[in-house]
Amino acid sequence: MSQDIHAHRILILDFGSQYTQLIARRVREIGVYCEIHPFDMSNEAIIAFAPRGIILAGGPESVHEADSPRAPQAVFDLKVPLFGICYGMQTMAEQMGGKVQGSDLREFGYARVDVVGKARLLDGIEDHVDDDGVLGLDVWMSHGDKVTEMPAGFHILASTPSCPIAAMADDARAYYGVQFHPEVTHTKQGLRILSRFVLDICGCAALWTPSNIVDDAIATVRAQVGSSKVLLGLSGGVDSSVVAALLHKAIGDQLTCVFVDNGLLRLHEGDQVMAMFAENMGVKVIRANAEDKFLGRLAGVADPEEKRKIIGRTFIEVFDEEATKLQDVKFLAQGTIYPDVIESAGAKTGKAHVIKSHHNVGGLPEDMQFELVEPLRELFKDEVRKIGLELGLPYDMVYRHPFPGPGLGVRILGEVKKEYADLLRQADHIFIEELRAFDWYHKTSQAFVVFQPVKSVGVVGDGRRYAWVVALRAVETIDFMTARWAHLPYELLEKVSNRIINEIAGISRVTYDVSSKPPATIEWE
């Protein structure tokens, strides 16, 4: 490697905001490596991390609470540029000698801030200029407390009628604070503001690019693996597909993939995976046809959590059987991505709440003595997709909708039967086919069909049909934490419904799910 793409790095300290990962994604989008760490990161770890700049993210707490989080002292001792966002601005102000008070008027949502001072952070960045020459920015606010007195050395940079110190600056030390959220798209100039801080003020070079990431990952894998053999569980999903392409480019025939066909995949999915990787790319792929084993274990089981656990355990068992047939495999590759790493760290603090168990929780048997290779563990999902394109994977594969690990097992409500899976596969295929035909597939974030174990009367020709009911589900979302049901055109819904009922004899009725998240989850189980 000619350059270290991690050398110019930003540290983001997390105080519990729902937007913290969004800040990191924006910084990466700018082309600079960054990491998220908890606000109580040790002073030694901060110094060892050697950031070019530090961002103090937002959070739900009030600085007035006795045990509210504080920034570590090393943040100030390092004397690198500092950017406090929302709560990050408030704790920064108070820790440096300023004052923060609760506000009678809380601000949530759109606001316009007037840029009333000068500083490098906002110089030349505005949305409006009023008749008096005052510059304005359209921003997204979400706060109750506000800074009422700035620490020594700071001046007011921006204000609103209810928040006179909406932004503050100390150019001499390159310390800045904003009460709004530059990381959300509602703040129109947010990316420019973050770019100004990261590139201009911190002096970072934009080294974090897809081609550089691929080169770096290949070099890292080769250094870790040497001439040893690597095993990968290939699912056909985006993450494992990108890992397969990346490892194949890095180590060629040292990689063997195991594709477990559990009988709960989408229509023709197994054949498509084999065609893409084994035939087109020349990757060594073992296909384990385990439909009977999976469906046998699931017989009579209706509880969603139990179904997930059975599917997870059976996958591990089948994978283990195939792995033991291979000789001299030293490494196991996984498609772990950065949000998994962050969530795992969060779970260790005891603050995480399990809504649904992940299908691979529990991992592989302890007697499988593999070392892990996780080439995507530094990457967000959007970065993984860009890497996939960089590696030559087809756009439609890289930008395919998410598919749950347990597959159709959690899209068939109640007991899973082969009959139900076959009907659901056909219905789902029709729905996706028509979404593409109407140019709605990439306008939705996730779309699928759910099989409901209830029958309904229908009329076909002169005959009466008593058959199964399915529900269509399509949502739009940025982060999958919240989602809105997709307002699909009636013509599209009508076409899908007519095709499903006319082409699939076992289905008599089609419904459309108009529930958003929250309160509903995206998947039904």
Curated annotation (Swiss-Prot):
Residues of the GMPS ATP-PPase domain: 208-400
Entry's EC annotation: 6.3.5.2
Family matches, as CDD domains: GATase1_GMP_Synthase (cd01742), GMP_synthase_C (cd01997)
GO cellular component, one term: cytosol
Catalytic reaction list: XMP + L-glutamine + ATP + H2O = GMP + L-glutamate + AMP + diphosphate + 2 H(+)
The Glutamine amidotransferase type-1 domain, residue ranges: 9-207
Disulfide bonds: none
Matching NCBIfam families: guaA_Cterm (TIGR00884), guaA_Nterm (TIGR00888), PRK00074.1 (NF000848)
Function of the molecule: Catalyzes the synthesis of GMP from XMP.
Protein name, entry field: GMP synthase [glutamine-hydrolyzing]
Organism: Pseudomonas aeruginosa (strain ATCC 15692 / DSM 22644 / CIP 104116 / JCM 14847 / LMG 12228 / 1C / PRS 101 / PAO1)
